[in-house]
């Protein structure tokens, strides 16, 4: 073979050499759709947990993943259209949270993998046939929704034994609320307490909801897990403090002045979502990824608030707390 022909052969063959033997081509950029139920600002901590999890698995925005965000800003009716936008943008995987978010995502596609970062019982809501074998294109994480809401009543009653009229904020737009209410009514009966429910469909309803509960002699307050109420927990906690109402909600609420918090650790749920994304991007089908249940729960007591309300928290309850705020 002539020298010139040999050089041509070598140069032409280089294009077929394996990647390790060539200059690395640009890595594939996976497109991730994020369907948020409220706003980015209200879920900053959770989104950072997701990004941290992805980074630990080798995924970084601007390098090998691009995340396209859509937020419904608390308007659940916008979710289907936002989900459709993400699906149309040719994403590789769709992330969302809550039952309304999961339903909108599921209705938008039966092909693109969906990972639910946190939702109530996905089986009872009809989104999957079973936790062990979700089938279809949806998997993710769930938490003991109704049980958490009912447990809050037990805890606030333990902290405030004299409370017999327990107020509950409910967003009727969230279909998961009914199962939680059923469990809470059962628990209230066992505690010999009356449950006073008030609907909160939007942020503007919160002040009026407080006025309604205080006029009915409410002695303690909680709410049914819902993205709208969760994202406004600090505001609700501040109003509870102003109205001298012992309240139990989640961690941001306790940090903002609520007496107590009991909830699944949302940071952990969003962080764990990254592992589902990794497996799906590497070829595992959602139907082959069993749904995980929340593993971390937090009990937090704000002793500063207890003092301000003139309450003495029982020592056994303090001993069970994961965190004390004083």
Regions found by a protein language model. Give the residues of each.
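Short hydrophobic alpha-helices and adjacent helix-cap/hinge residues
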Residues: 1-326
């Amino acid at each position: 073979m002539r020298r010139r022909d040999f050089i041509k052969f070598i140069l032409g063959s280089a294009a077929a050499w394996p990647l390790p033997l060539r200059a690395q081509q640009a890595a594939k950029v996976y497109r991730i759709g994020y369907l948020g139920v409220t706003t980015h600002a209200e879920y900053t901590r959770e989104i950072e947990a997701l990004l941290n999890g992805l980074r630990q698995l080798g995924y970084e925005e601007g390098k090998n993943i691009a995340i396209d965000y859509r937020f419904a800003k608390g308007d659940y009716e916008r979710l289907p259209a936002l989900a459709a936008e993400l699906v149309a943008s040719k994403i590789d995987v769709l992330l969302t949270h809550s039952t309304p978010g999961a339903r909108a995502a599921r209705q938008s596609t039966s092909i693109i993998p969906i990972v639910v970062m946190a939702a109530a019982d996905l089986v009872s809501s009809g989104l999957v046939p079973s936790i062990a074998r979700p089938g279809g294109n949806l998997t993710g994480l769930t938490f003991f929704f109704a049980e958490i809401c009912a447990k809050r009543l037990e805890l606030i009653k333990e902290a405030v034994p004299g409370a017999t009229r327990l107020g509950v904020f409910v967003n009727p737009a969230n279909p998961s609320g009914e199962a939680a209410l059923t469990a809470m009514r059962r628990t209230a009966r066992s505690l010999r307490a009356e449950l006073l429910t008030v609907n909160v469909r939007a942020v503007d309803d919160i002040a009026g909801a407080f006025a309604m509960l205080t006029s009915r002699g409410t002695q303690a307050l909680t709410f049914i897990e819902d993205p709208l109420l969760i994202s406004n927990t600090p505001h609700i906690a501040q109003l509870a403090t102003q109205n001298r109402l012992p309240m139990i909600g989640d961690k941001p609420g306790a940090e903002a002045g609520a007496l107590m918090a009991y909830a699944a650790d949302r940071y952990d749920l969003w962080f764990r979502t990254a592992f589902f994304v990794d497996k799906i991007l590497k070829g595992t089908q959602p139907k082959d990824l069993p749904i995980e249940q929340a593993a971390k729960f937090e009990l937090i007591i704000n002793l500063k608030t207890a003092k301000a309300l003139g309450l003495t928290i029982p020592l056994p309850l303090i001993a069970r707390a994961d965190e004390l705020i004083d």
